[in-house]
Amino acid sequence: ATTAPKAARVSLGELSMAKVEMSAPGTPRLVGQARDVQATKSAAALQSLWQWKNTVVGGKVAAISFNAEGAYGLRLGVLVKQLPGSATVRVYTQSAPDKVFQISGQAILQLIERNQAAGDQSDAARTWWTPDTGEGEATLEVELPPGVAASALDIAVPQLSHIFENLSLPTAQEYQEQVEAAKINESDPCNLDAN
């Protein structure tokens, strides 16, 4: 296992809830909002932030930490134009760098290939969305094997999904429904059925 590299930092301020379009009654509840990330919107911008370090086996590794104030979770939208299949991509949080989601560059390329085979040639088809980290920070790490130059990487993170609802807690309505359901099942232990 490799030690997590020191991550460059990208910080977004608090999400203005006034700009969030809330869900209409009777429709699925909106729990997150797409946010533009100017600091990493292009491959050139992202490339300037990578702080490449040599790995023990002779490859290179770098990481970037994205922080969105007030978020209960983050998903990074990684726009892939060129990614070596031999690369390893990891997602974790700075608070728990040992809890890692890891995927090969090849697996990401196959997901994108399926999107394009279905007829979608847009940037959306070339975007891989990371899993939700469950907190307001997400670290994207890329490891390149020996012999693969950093210039072989052409990715950007133009957007992230800012989860603004705490999905581990019930909404007020869900809580009230739980309370009502509990009342139905309440009984006094001294009231026994004599049948």
Model-based region annotation:
Residues A1-N195:
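Domain-level representation of secreted and single-pass membrane ectodomains enriched
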